[in-house]
């Protein structure tokens, strides 16, 4: 479960990490009043779970009351990559001389958490990791003992952080790890951690993903989660239907039964140069209505250009899946997005006979199904 920026910053601030002065606003007037109280210049930032908010018009720097009103009117109520913006964070603009990245996540290959620091902050850290992996210093942590101060200092110095602020950055990293551990974090990061001309460190952004299966022991975070889901109609719909759903940034919609099967499909979409739009696990024993709901939901994502079903029947029967797909598609005069289906396992042959091949493309192997779905998505892009 991912918290909004304003929620993550509150958690960070409560733990002692410096953050800019800010106020949450739900209306234009509230945003203007907040800007006046904080003092210009301020940043007005859409509170939605998407990357690249600035490039998409979801973050604006303003220097006057008139600019604040205009920016708030533009951002509040806008659709940002499929997310409805209902709240903005009005935040003090930080005058900085340098930007860093600091983060803690789980290295599943090593089976241990890893702390990361880079002097290439303020940009997409995934791109940095791909293009210049040596620009990110890493330190694995033994969860039995936690992060020692010397480890924090070591990774900060290895990243090339200036000595004048190295101890403060190490302190922030140590706190970030403690939050990751105490709050059952999946990812915690600050990008950018800004360095001012006075050698102060300030968390200008905040990301906190929490293990959803651990929310029973994180009541405060769970309460935040109800608010964090607001504004994303697809995630709300997934909760209503009882689907395990994660929205991604690509254009190939993915529906499967079982987390491992869906993850494999995501990996194959990426392998064949496609971009997954979502993770959607309908669960075991899915009936026709449930399959139809899943397809309707993925269709409603405007970023999706093609859909692939990957179903391996155990208690989920192929004929039920086929009936659900037909049920969902027969309501349309024209199929809005191409659908590719791969069925295997229980009643798979019956299911393939039931499927209306005028409405879907049937493939007999997962590789063929994924390649076809990626091709369809690329045809739409072209």
Curated annotation (Swiss-Prot):
Q: Which residues bind Mg(2+)?
A: 191, 205
- Annotated ATP binding sites: 45, 52-54, 91, 94, 99
Alphabetically list the UniProt keywords. ATP-binding, Ligase, Magnesium, Metal-binding, Nucleotide-binding, Tricarboxylic acid cycle
- What catalytic activity does the UniProt entry give for this protein? succinate + ATP + CoA = succinyl-CoA + ADP + phosphate; GTP + succinate + CoA = succinyl-CoA + GDP + phosphate
State the Gene Ontology terms under molecular function.
ATP binding; magnesium ion binding; succinate-CoA ligase (ADP-forming) activity; succinate-CoA ligase (GDP-forming) activity
Q: Name one GO biological process term.
A: succinyl-CoA metabolic process
The record's family statement is: Belongs to the succinate/malate CoA ligase beta subunit family.
Listed name of the protein: Succinate--CoA ligase [ADP-forming] subunit beta
Per the UniProt entry, what species is this protein from, by scientific name?
Haloarcula marismortui (strain ATCC 43049 / DSM 3752 / JCM 8966 / VKM B-1809)
The gene behind this protein is sucC
């Amino acid at each position: 479960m991912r918290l909004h920026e304003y929620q993550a910053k509150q958690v960070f601030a409560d733990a002692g990490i410096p953050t800019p002065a800010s106020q949450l606003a739900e209306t234009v007037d509230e945003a203007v009043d907040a800007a006046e109280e904080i003092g210009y210049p301020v940043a007005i930032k859409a509170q939605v779970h998407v990357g690249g908010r600035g490039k998409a018009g979801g973050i604006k720097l303003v220097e006057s009351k008139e600019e604040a009103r205009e920016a708030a009117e533009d951002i509040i109520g806008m659709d940002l990559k499929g997310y409805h913006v209902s709240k903005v964070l009005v935040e003090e603009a930080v005058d900085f001389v340098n930007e860093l990245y600091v983060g803690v996540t789980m290295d599943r290959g090593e089976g241990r958490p890893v702390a990361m620091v880079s002097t290439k902050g303020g940009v997409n850290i995934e791109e940095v990791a791909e293009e210049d992996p040596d620009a990110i210093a890493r330190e694995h942590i033994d969860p039995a003992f936690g992060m020692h101060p010397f480890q924090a200092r070591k990774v900060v110095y290895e990243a090339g952080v200036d000595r004048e602020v190295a101890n403060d950055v190490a302190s922030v990293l140590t706190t970030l790890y403690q939050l990751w551990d105490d709050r059952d974090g999946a990812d915690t990061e600050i990008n950018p951690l800004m360095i001012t001309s006075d050698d102060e460190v300030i968390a200008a952004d905040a990301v906190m993903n929490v293990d959803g299966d651990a929310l029973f022991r994180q009541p405060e975070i769970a309460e935040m989660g109800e608010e964090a889901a607001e504004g994303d109609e697809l995630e709300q719909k997934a909760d209503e239907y009882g689907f395990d759903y994660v929205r991604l940034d690509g254009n190939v919609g993915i529906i499967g039964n079982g987390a491992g099967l869906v993850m494999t499909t995501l990996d194959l979409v990426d392998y064949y140069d496609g971009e997954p739009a979502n993770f959607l696990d309908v669960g075991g024993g899915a009936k026709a209505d449930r399959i139809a709901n899943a397809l309707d939901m993925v269709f409603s994502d405007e970023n999706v250009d093609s859909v692939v079903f990957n179903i391996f029947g155990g208690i989920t029967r192929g004929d039920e899946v086929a009936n659900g797909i037909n049920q969902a598609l027969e309501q349309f005069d024209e199929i809005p997005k191409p659908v590719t289906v791969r069925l295997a396992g229980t009643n798979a042959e019956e299911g393939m006979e039931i499927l209306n091949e005028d409405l879907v493309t049937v493939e007999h192997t997962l590789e063929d199904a994924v390649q076809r779905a990626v091709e369809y998505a690329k045809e739409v892009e072209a």
